[in-house]
Amino acid sequence: MKVQLTGISLLLLVGTGYFTFDVISPVLLIGAGIGGFILAIVTIFKKEWAPITVPLYAILEGTLLGGISYMYNSSYNGIVTNAILLTLGVLVSLLIAYRSGYIKATENFKLGIFAATGGIAIVYFINFIMGFFGSGLGVMSINNASPLSIGFSVVVVIIASLNLVLDFDFIEEGAEKGAPKYMEWYAAFGLMVTLVWLYLEILRLLAKLNSRD
């Protein structure tokens, strides 16, 4: 699979985020979030539409990330730059480790990451439901700088990082099997989703660490 499509997707994501960094419009952010979610669902169930849905998703997700990043940076100056650098560092390091054969996506590895990711998703879902009742899990709060809360974020960052290995494996497997063109866009979508998740989790972790000051 061609890496150019991944590059295009990330360029749209980052570029849109950059230009909407200081555009604080609740309507725009909510619209981008809902639109991005819908496009993500469509992409998952209609992979052949990926050449159209993925670039649009990147633009909407970039808009949402721009607003989120601005809010974090307003509270903790410089946190966004640090989060971006750390995300890139993790991406490059794991890519080198994967290409060098130090990390391999074995079946047991995949099963473990799938299970861990599913567990994290359940925790987030529980916290989401609790939010409707004016409550929430303490470890999820960015203002909670307790060892347990920080430890939870570290674990989530590690799991999010290891999901990149699954993306690398998917891209490599698709290239070896001569996957159709639209699957190149779908692979780019998967990698982009993981990177966005990793970036947001690093932001949360850095916010918790900064809240101790």
Task: Pin down the residues of each PLM region.
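A hydrophobic alpha-helical transmembrane-helix feature that marks the membrane cores
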Residues: 1-213
